[in-house]
Amino acid sequence: MDLSSKTVVQVVMLALIAQVTFSQHWSYGWLPGGKRSVGELEATIRMMDTGGVMALPEETGAHIPERLRPYDVMSKKRMPHK
């Protein structure tokens, strides 16, 4: 490569690196400088005050699982000859 094409490649690389370095990640609900919008913060605080608990509908066919027992008790029940 001659000197002018090397210079062009270096300038392009410098521009790409500068863009990545100085760009800011924008996320939903965030303002420049890493600050959150007040409305979203207020909604979060209200949810925390109420406990943020949602009532789940009860399943009609749900059953309570049997309590787990130690392995040796289970093996004795299944193999009475030991």
From Swiss-Prot:
It is found in: Secreted. PROSITE patterns: GNRH. The modification Pyrrolidone carboxylic acid is found at Q24. Keywords: Amidation, Cleavage on pair of basic residues, Hormone, Pyrrolidone carboxylic acid, Secreted, Signal. It holds the Pfam family GnRH. Residues 1-23 form the signal peptide. The modification Glycine amide is found at G33. InterPro entries: GnRH (IPR002012), Gonadoliberin (IPR019792). Its main location: secreted. GO terms for cellular component: extracellular space. One of its GO terms (molecular function) is gonadotropin-releasing hormone receptor binding. Stimulates the secretion of gonadotropins. Belongs to the GnRH family. This is Progonadoliberin-3. It comes from Oncorhynchus masou (Cherry salmon). The gene is gnrh3.
